[in-house]
Amino acid sequence: MKKKIILTLMLGICLPIVAQQVDEINLKEVEVKAARFVLKPDGRLIFPSDAQKNASTSGFSLINKLALPGIRVDETLRTVTSIRQEGTVQLRINGIIATKEELLSMEPKAVKSIHFIDQPGIRYGTDVAFVIDIRVQKAANGYVLGFDGVNSVTTYNGDNSFYYNANHNNSEIGVTYDFGYNDFRGERTDEAARYELVDGSLYTVQRNDETARNRYFGHCIQLKYNLADSASYVFQTRLSTAFSRMPDNNSVCQITTPTQSYKAFSEQKDKDFTPILDLYFFRDLGKHQSVTANMVGTFIRTDLESSYNEGAPYAYSVAGNSYSLIGEAIYENRLKPFLLSLGFNGSLKYTRNSYQKDVSLTDNLHHESVYCFAEIKGKLFGANYTADIGVSNQRYRQDENRYNYWLWRPKLTLSYPFLKVFNVKYGFEMSEHMSQMANISRAEIRQNSMEWTVGNPELRPYKRTSHTFSLDFEQPRISSGIKMEYRINSNCSMDKYVRTADNRFLYSKTNQQNINMLYVNNYTRWDMVPEKLSVMVFGGIYRFFNQGDDYRHYHTSYNYGANVQAYLNQWTIMGYADNGWEFIEGEHLNRNHSTIYLSVSYRVGAFEIGLFCQHPFRKNPIMNSSKVLNRYLNKETFYRNSSFGNMISLNFAWKFTKGRQYKQMQRTMNNKDTDTGILK
């Protein structure tokens, strides 16, 4: 009777988090063995084929071969992004957020399954579009030593990783080192701007880069110790230190106005130092109960110098320090009719950024957050459900500016399988979003002779409400899905342009009416020759509604693409192409232009050699473009980079293992901080 009362109360309120160890309760999901995945309320559980695992050298390589809908993988730059830029793609290994080094050093053959979540709840953080959780077996004994490097032969760009992991009984130690670099000299920005001045006249400016150089060097070393008995406890500590440097990024720009033509010079130097300590603990309490805790401490040191000379010198420097502490605890009880989860997440952050020279001020930003939640998950009347209730609080103060923002956050996901090949799903969520810390700075940064970027200390968090509906069709060799979502961002952070009496154009962010989006998309995958040749195509239509205090902007865009994969013994051949992604947010119309990736790799024993080509047959591709649609300022900008045109990179991977034996492992946490709060 007590369990029935709990179930009734939770379903009556229906509010948020996300699944923990979702495969530990029998929901009688739709399973299609030949298709190697199981549909779940929040996504799907994928079982990679032996051909996919054998042809992969790292986590990035394996994710790329899965051809996940809405996901773009760049094996050269070691990035996984959302095609539609809905938010970040969160990568995990056994439930814990994974670093790039861990994804490179993981052994694809030890992968049991991959949980692809396309409706992540707030349990995974804010602005997360997808979660990819790779579940691997933990090695009981032996060691692995390896190297994975991608280096371009047509430009100065690369990323190289060395790793070592050793296991003995319940203990594991790991060391990884990563070095990345680039020196791009083919970047060019072309900009045409039209300003309406106070007297009603129009003033036009053409800005065209003549030369530009962008250099980056990054080092990261990570130490990890893990002590685990998969039946009762897990303890893990991870210490990492990252150091990056941009020694001298500069450009020379030709500026043309109705009365004169002259050159402008810009230069920027940047150094970052980021140590992170991550502690994780899991304990099985018995009687289907468990508790999980995680704590992450981060320090970010930033030194930035920027200068711009457009007839008169302008320069500023920033010395920034950011301290943050994030803690989380979750209690789970696997009751017979449902899985109950109760949790708490809290964070403390202090940021001090001191601006010098032409910008003279010090930002002292204090931010605290608390989030409490409860979740149940089970099966009722043939439908799988996940129902959540939670409340969050965000607090911020900076001198006399402060806010105290509370929000109830409900989330409900229902899915129903029928006719053995179909699954229909509905999701509702109310979540909280906040702008980057840099946007609430008190700084005012000059961009050129006409424009300034201004922080807004009065910016507040805002509420997002989303409704999603999807229908999936699954057969042994073909799968297809259609998804529709309507997203409402109320009183959200939107663009604000102000024209001053002396004809300066100030850009900032303010809370305004709403930004809404409606879209419908589809993906279809066909295994033409099982485990040998597969094709995936996707497409969608998107409608955007932007309603500011003094403007209205609407836009419709289309997105489509395809992915082809072929496995021929030791050879793997892949091709990917899409038409890019266009969206409007506030008064900016942005477009990421079309992309083509081609790759071929050959594997023999512990070695693999691969060849990657980006933007083939394009000498100087447009990477992205944007338009400013303000009534006083109209501007169109194109960013090109010839370094990426016909870009060819070589991948060499070597992995040596000895005495590796595996046992299954499951973990469930994610916390980190990367926001410096610096306005640029």
Spans of features found by a protein language model:
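N-terminal periplasmic accessory domains that precede
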Residues: 29, 59-64, 78-81, 101, ...
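Transmembrane beta-strands of outer-membrane beta-barrel pores
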Residues: 149-153, 168, 179-183, 241-245, ...
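Outer-membrane beta-barrel signature, preferentially recognizing the C-terminal barrel domain
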Residues: 403, 422, 432-481, 508-518, ...
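Short, acidic, small-residue-rich periplasmic hinge/interaction motif at the N-terminus
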Residues: 20-52, 61, 76-77
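Face-selective signature of the C-terminal outer-membrane beta-barrel domain
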Residues: 218-246, 266-401, 405-410, 417-420, ...
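Extracytoplasmic beta-strand/coil segments of soluble accessory domains associated
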Residues: 60-96
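Short acidic/polar hinge/loop motifs at secondary-structure boundaries
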Residues: 94-122, 162
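Outer membrane beta-barrel strand-and-loop segments of large Gram-negative receptors
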Residues: 324-326, 456, 460, 466, ...
